[in-house]
């Protein structure tokens, strides 16, 4: 935007009239009659009154104290003089202004704001996931970086038609590489895709028509896509433009709207992943060489951005309403502002409203249309959100701003001073300024944020700054009446009034006072004073004589006095006859303090040389110099001794520190060794415990196995003297041992209790002999032959249903009877008892 002329700048002066808001505030529900004016804005430009334009890169004072002095705000716009805004006085008096009420309803708490670092990262690249952990162990390597395609993907919730009234939600640029153009192996590619460094797409997973797929693609933290198959990205309904590298470099086949979309998209150079360093460097060079040369179509004009909050000055709301009044879509703007009023009532509210207004009638010459230009984006937000940090909220906010910029709704940004707390205001404006400049927008204006600058700006605009200088001593001539003449004579001078801003009046006054005290001001006037006493800075016309002609009256007197002294000295040395003559030296009040002009000092030159006073002063001076030198030498010696002591102490401390480090290292090594020994002991103990537990389990099992046999032996021990049991038991054991050695397969070790008697032992011995004879024969065994023998067929001889597999079996199929006594009628009780008795002593023989 071209800056408006100096005489056309509009100045909004804040007045102390907050108590009269109900009378002077225009209503948002503006009546179409618009009978009576309430606000009057004038262009105050005269010969002795000038404006001050702040520099564009002025920094905000974030730690300034909060004050309630009137503020001066310069709007860089063109408007006619004596602009009157008519409103309905009855509505304004009774109901008040909803916008004023919204603006000054609640005071912003006086708190400091520490902006997190994440907000700055969000402003520059709102698609990066800060929690994503990546390891820079490998690098995405491209075979030919010039072979790529790209496309711009709009948010799936945005509209496809170019309507500035529609709120867009941002867009994103993607670069596409084929899998054959990537040198990394499959494992690295899959790892990059899992970490979110790249987006891996194949034809099976590509679902361009699904909204969820578009959202995942848009919200992905990477801008680089690697395709395995031929994928048609034109199928994506939300793609604004798809192009190749050749089209971008030539820029001949791209439409102006496509150029804007490409230039203002989020590029891969905004990524922070170390794996994409080569790609980032490549696209950074591409942006600097190609994208900056893309000619953007700015025929739509320059737009203005209003940031409207619910805590601002009443005068600022006047300026906004004055700007909106007379607009073609005035009613629409006011209705949208009123619709957000209730949402902003709560202090904890987190609401924000975006709406754009398009100027359709430009040829009517309306001054408000010149102010709004073509497009106007109005943003209403609660400033309390600036005091807290919500990452999702800031992502959405900057995404909205980004889309408005990309769609050319906002090419230039207007920032007004709308937040009352200066510390909060400085943070917010600085943050918005950084965001818009990151996307290539021009911040047209920034308001004064401190009271000192406001006072200085108001003083320099309303009244010239006066400086009183002693022209006799400093040789400075001030001409207040020539300031406008000089500005008119040099309209293009870079040192003119409109390019300077007074920063500190107190510092200027101190410099001027220093000049007044110093009679020899040639050096000062030639350098710093010439820069300091500029007409643009002080509001003065300063005439400074050249150094060679700047000799003052005092300097002339000093030079004449020095010449007289030299002549008198030469005459005294050349002629001894003049020793008795008297040389009269005249001293004025300015040279010798305390001596008036009518006092004289008379003495001869020899008397002056030989005077006791002079000798006394000379001896005293020499003594003082000698004492001072001796004192300095002593101080130097003491300092040297101190330095030596400090060096010795330092050496000893260093040595002690080395010893401590060595001892600490030895202790650490010993501790590590002890830890290893303890660990080895623990391992040995654990293995030994496992072995002992295993042995204990085996002992328990053997104990359970031998417990019934021991009980039976005890029974026999108790009855050893009854019925000749000892005599029969030895043959029984011999026969049982022979049977076990001959047929070990008859019994598996299970024991059954029984009663002992002499007859039973005789019967058992006979049965065992019969079993041994029967089991050692080579005849075929039939089930009927086993009745009464104490033997039975094994379980393998029967099928699932309990039927014999065959009619006859080999003797190896025999087993000791394994049924309880009395369960089977086919076996006698004696055979069962013998079988059980044999089982009890099977493991003992």
Curated annotation (Swiss-Prot):
Keywords per UniProt: Coiled coil
Residue runs in coiled coils: 622-707
Region (Disordered): 17-37, 550-573
Protein name per UniProt: Uncharacterized protein VP6
Organism (species): Fiji disease virus (isolate Sugarcane)
């Amino acid at each position: 935007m071209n800056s408006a002329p100096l005489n056309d700048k509009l100045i909004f002066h804040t007045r102390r009239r907050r108590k009269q808001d109900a009378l002077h505030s225009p209503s948002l529900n503006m009546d179409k009659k618009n009978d009576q004016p309430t606000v009057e804005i004038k262009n105050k430009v005269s010969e002795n009154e000038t404006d001050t334009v702040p520099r564009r890169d002025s920094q905000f004072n974030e730690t300034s104290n909060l004050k309630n002095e009137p503020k001066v705000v310069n709007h860089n716009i063109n408007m006619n003089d004596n602009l009157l805004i008519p409103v309905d006085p009855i509505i304004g008096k009774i109901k008040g202004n909803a916008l004023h009420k919204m603006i000054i309803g609640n005071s912003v708490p006086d708190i400091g704001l520490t902006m997190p670092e994440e907000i700055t990262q969000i402003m520059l690249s709102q698609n990066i996931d800060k929690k994503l952990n990546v390891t820079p162990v490998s690098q995405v390597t491209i075979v030919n970086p010039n072979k790529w395609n790209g496309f711009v993907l709009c948010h799936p919730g945005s509209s496809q038609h170019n309507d500035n009234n529609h709120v867009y939600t941002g867009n994103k640029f993607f670069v596409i590489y084929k899998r054959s153009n990537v040198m990394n192996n499959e494992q690295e590619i899959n790892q990059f895709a899992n970490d979110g460094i790249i987006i891996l797409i194949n034809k099976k997973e590509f679902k361009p028509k699904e909204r969820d797929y578009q959202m995942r693609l848009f919200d992905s933290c990477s801008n680089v896509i690697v395709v395995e198959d031929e994928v048609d990205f034109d199928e994506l309904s939300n793609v604004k433009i798809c192009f190749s590298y050749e089209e971008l470099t030539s820029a001949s086949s791209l439409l102006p709207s496509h150029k804007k979309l490409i230039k203002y998209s989020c590029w891969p150079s905004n990524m922070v992943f170390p794996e994409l360093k080569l790609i980032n460097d490549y696209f950074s060079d591409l942006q600097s060489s190609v994208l900056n040369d893309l000619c953007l179509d700015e025929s739509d004009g320059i737009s203005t951005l209003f940031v409207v909050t619910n805590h601002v000055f009443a005068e600022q709301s006047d300026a906004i309403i004055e700007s909106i009044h007379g607009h073609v879509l005035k009613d629409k703007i006011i209705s949208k502002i009123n619709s957000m009023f209730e949402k902003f009532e709560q202090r904890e509210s987190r609401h924000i409203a975006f709406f754009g207004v398009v100027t359709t009638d430009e040829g009517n010459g309306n001054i408000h249309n010149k102010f709004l230009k073509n497009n106007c984006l109005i943003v209403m937000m609660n400033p309390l959100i600036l005091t807290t940090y919500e990452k999702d909220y800031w992502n959405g906010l900057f995404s909205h701003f980004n889309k408005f910029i990309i769609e050319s709704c906002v090419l230039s940004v207007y920032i007004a001073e709308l937040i009352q707390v200066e510390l909060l205001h400085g943070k917010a404006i600085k943050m918005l300024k950084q965001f818009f400049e990151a996307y290539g927008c021009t911040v047209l204006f920034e308001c004064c944020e401190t009271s000192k600058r406001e006072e200085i700006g108001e003083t320099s605009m309303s009244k010239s700054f006066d400086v009183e200088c002693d022209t006799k001593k400093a040789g400075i001539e001030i001409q207040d009446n020539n300031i406008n003449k000089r500005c008119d004579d040099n309209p293009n001078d870079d040192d003119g009034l409109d390019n300077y801003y007074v920063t500190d009046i107190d510092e200027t006054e101190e410099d001027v006072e220093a000049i007044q005290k110093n009679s020899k001001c040639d050096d000062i006037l030639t350098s710093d004073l010439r820069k300091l006493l500029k007409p643009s800075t002080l509001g003065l016309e300063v005439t400074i004589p050249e150094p060679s002609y700047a000799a003052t009256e005092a300097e002339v007197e000093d030079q004449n006095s020095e010449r007289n002294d030299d002549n008198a000295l030469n005459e005294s040395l050349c002629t001894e006859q003049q020793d008795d003559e008297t040389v009269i030296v005249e001293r004025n009040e300015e040279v010798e303090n305390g001596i008036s002009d009518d006092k004289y000092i008379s003495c001869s030159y020899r008397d002056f040389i030989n005077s006791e006073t002079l000798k006394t002063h000379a001896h005293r001076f020499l003594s003082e110099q000698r004492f001072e030198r001796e004192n300095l030498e002593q101080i130097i010696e003491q300092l040297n001794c101190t330095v030596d002591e400090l060096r010795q102490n330092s050496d000893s401390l260093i040595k002690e520190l080395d010893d401590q480090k060595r001892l600490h290292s030895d202790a650490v090594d010993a501790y590590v060794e002890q830890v290893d020994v303890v660990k080895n002991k623990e391992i040995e103990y654990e293995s030994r415990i496992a072995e002992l537990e295993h042995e204990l389990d085996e002992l328990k099992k053997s104990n359970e196995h031998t417990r019934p046999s021991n009980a039976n032996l005890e029974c026999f021990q108790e009855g050893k003297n009854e019925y000749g049991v000892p005599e029969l038991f030895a043959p029984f054991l011999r026969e049982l041992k022979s049977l076990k050695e001959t047929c070990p397969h008859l019994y598996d070790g299970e024991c059954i209790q029984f009663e002992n008697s002499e007859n039973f032992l005789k019967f058992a011995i006979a049965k065992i002999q019969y079993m041994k004879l029967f089991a050692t024969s080579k005849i075929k065994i039939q089930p009927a032959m086993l009745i009464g023998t104490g033997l039975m067929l094994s379980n393998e001889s029967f099928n699932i249903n309990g039927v014999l597999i065959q009619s006859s079996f080999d003797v190896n199929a025999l087993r000791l009877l394994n049924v309880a006594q009395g369960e089977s009628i086919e076996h006698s009780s004696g055979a069962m008892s013998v079988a059980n008795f044999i089982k009890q002593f099977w493991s003992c023989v």
